[in-house]
Amino acid sequence: MAYLIFSLSLLLIYLGLALALHVQFGMLGIANFGVVGFWGFGMYMMGIFQAELNMSFVDALFIVLVLSVAVSALMGWLVVRLDPQATLCTTIAFGAIIALLVVTEKWITMGVVGLGTIRYPFRIGGATEYIYFFFLVGIVVGMQVLVLRLHKSPTGKLLQAVRDNEELCASLGKNTFQIKMFWFVLTSVVMCLLGALSAPLNQFLTPNMIVPSVTFAVWIALVLGGKEHALGAMVGVFVTFGFFDILIETYAPVSPELAVVVPNMKLFIYGLALMAVLVFRPTGFLAPTTPPERVWGEMRKVAATAGSGGLALAKAGKDRLEATVFMPAKTTPKKSSEAGADEEAKE
């Protein structure tokens, strides 16, 4: 039962990471492949403050919050203006740098030896793990509710508009850099805090926890569930981590000979499922909550009446819309008959 609670708690952490990535990529269009970097940074900072400096959970969490804002703001300043390919390389490099620092900076991270033991914040006899589990449930449920409300709010529509056509939003007076910067920093800080909450769950931290497979697992879950749907992250995490890591690997009646093959088979099935979804259902198991036409409907109305006759033409594609803004000619040439009449009047 204790291992089940641990597995479900870890599932909640992955669900929180997927929700944060959903806002970053699904709503805003920033491809963050450094999820494990933010998560690992928060986890190791919490471990250092609690295990090495003997701080309380609340004090350590507050300092992790401050440091996370600084690191996320630095990364946001670097990646927000970049194109998708450069963003991909930069965020992957960030995750690799965090993993390298954990190994090399032995004076504070203990290197490959590991760091621990990290205490649970709530210690009430044998119910400590259960209380922490329900604590995580409350946090992740709150995140899911906020994401659902964000999708229905004007802010959510604005994020989707920036994702689909940043140039058009900028032409309408929206500060797209500020919008992307704020939401990237906010969601990255959430990833760091989820890492901090993972530290008491693992209790003993080692560098082999900060591996790219964490990022790929979150991405696969989001793509399978539906990157643009408010519930896509939840569905994807339950299908991948919940089904394979909890039900199959833990409770399926597998012989000892096949138990070694199950983890590799899991990755193989992940790959097949991902290819099938990308080919037959690119939007994931769930369709987008808000059709692009509905998002751009209001934008077209605003563009059509914006300053000195500006006109916006939106063309609906399968997954996104491309918009073109042009200015009408300043003068309209007169017809030949009208021009001749004017000349005769002057004479």
Task: Give the label of every model feature segment.
Residues 1-347:
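Transmembrane alpha-helices and adjacent helix-loop boundaries
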